[in-house]
Amino acid sequence: MIEDNKENKDHSSERGRVTLIFSLKNEVGGLIKALKIFQENHVNLLHIESRKSKRRNSEFEIFVDCDINREQLNDIFPLLKSHTTVLSVDSPDQLPEKEDVMETVPWFPKKISDLDFCANRVLLYGSELDADHPGFKDNVYRRRRKYFAELAMNYKHGDPIPKIEFTEEEIKTWGTIFRELNKLYPTHACREYLRNLPLLSKYCGYREDNVPQLEDVSNFLKERTGFSIRPVAGYLSPRDFLSGLAFRVFHCTQYVRHSSDPLYTPEPDTCHELLGHVPLLAEPSFAQFSQEIGLASLGASEETVQKLATCYFFTVEFGLCKQDGQLRVFGAGLLSSISELRHALSGHAKVKPFDPKVACKQECLITSFQDVYFVSESFEDAKEKMREFAKTVKRPFGVKYNPYTQSIQVLRDSKSITSAMNELRHDLDVVNDALARVSRWPSV
């Protein structure tokens, strides 16, 4: 990423010939993946050749001459690094060099299809299970998990989510969870959750005898809030997961927990995702709250991402709110756990007002009840507090989501900021025009 030079001229569109040398691992399709990056970013290749690497016998080195501008080079460089080892970049004088204040900024997706590069970096579980996992000794369950993992790993942006023929055992497990949780929702869940759950039953097949299909749920959410579902094999890193939220994409597991203990899972399964998260992702205010946490994480330091992820944990996963003078639950981890849902509103749980500066320092517990739960006055209250907290994130740029192109606008110079202001000015003109029309016809 390139900043303006001292003359305040924008050279990002000036073109030049650049030679890149990168090494490929000896794997099927490695070169195709690398060349696709150039194609998708509209970079013209002038010459390409390959040779056996002199550094390692198992790798090949690729020489590429291309006609490229500085902005394109900034876009493809981190993408290449995710698939290859970039050994050399020869940038001639005619491609203007400018001070790069963003060299140390961690890579983040700029367009929604970039999520293909990070959605498969599963940290935990997936097709592999720990020895203490309920399904570790069940070979049939392990094969089933491998099947779901392969589906998620092969998924690319734009693909329809594969429809699943769930087994009788999986449907029974889902049914037990669905039935028991629905006994608690009327007295424990927030009103927004209760408003959306019947719609999911009507349009997505939320029933005791049916596990909803992620494709149906994704289409429903797109119409409600612009969110979509992307299948994932298991736990992602906080950075990769939050990056998806910035694009209103929710990474969602498709497997069902082991049937030996329907009321417990050491990991997020599709029961947790569908019953815990989805009803509130259909709520506009909550959807915006989730996206803003994701946007704040883009390009942030590891320390900041961890703080944002912890705030997400104590709101989106385990958050409480006040409604009609009573505590109600909006956290997905609670809304998908019978025992902890009861505990959180039992009067015995420790609760504190939600403050991001406090919540981000609280330890997140995975296999036991939380030591403390944080209470927000409303989604809007939580959103405003997170906005103030996001202002403390140290980045040499701002970001803005463009819903038309499903891409991130990086606001880092006068040109990009002016462009964003012009878009806002147009939106304000539309609103002002509407106000003027309404004032002329007050009965409308």
UniProtKB/Swiss-Prot annotation:
Q: State the reactions this protein catalyses.
A: (6R)-L-erythro-5,6,7,8-tetrahydrobiopterin + L-tryptophan + O2 = 5-hydroxy-L-tryptophan + (4aS,6R)-4a-hydroxy-L-erythro-5,6,7,8-tetrahydrobiopterin
| GO terms classed as biological process | bone remodeling; circadian rhythm; mammary gland alveolus development; negative regulation of ossification; platelet degranulation; positive regulation of fat cell differentiation; regulation of hemostasis; response to immobilization stress
MF (Gene Ontology): iron ion binding; tryptophan 5-monooxygenase activity
Annotated InterPro entries: ACT-like_dom_sf (IPR045865), ACT_dom (IPR002912), ArAA_hydroxylase (IPR001273), ArAA_hydroxylase_Fe/CU_BS (IPR018301), ArAA_hydroxylase_sf (IPR036951), Aro-AA_hydroxylase_C_sf (IPR036329), Aromatic-AA_hydroxylase_C (IPR019774), Trp_5_mOase (IPR005963)
Specify the ACT domain's residue ranges.
19-94
| PTM | Ubiquitinated, leading to its degradation by the proteasome. Ubiquitinated is triggered by phosphorylation.
Q: Name one GO cellular component term.
A: neuron projection
Sites of Phosphoserine modification: 58
- Kindly state which keywords UniProt assigns to this record, in alphabetical order: Iron, Metal-binding, Monooxygenase, Oxidoreductase, Phosphoprotein, Serotonin biosynthesis, Ubl conjugation
Q: Does the keyword Signal apply?
A: no
The family annotation for this protein states: Belongs to the biopterin-dependent aromatic amino acid hydroxylase family.
Q: Subunit arrangement?
A: Homotetramer. Interacts with DNAJC12.
Job description of the protein: Oxidizes L-tryptophan to 5-hydroxy-l-tryptophan in the rate-determining step of serotonin biosynthesis.
Report the protein name in the record.
Answer: Tryptophan 5-hydroxylase 1
Q: Tell me which species this is from.
A: Rattus norvegicus
Q: What is the lineage of its organism?
A: Eukaryota, Metazoa, Chordata, Craniata, Vertebrata
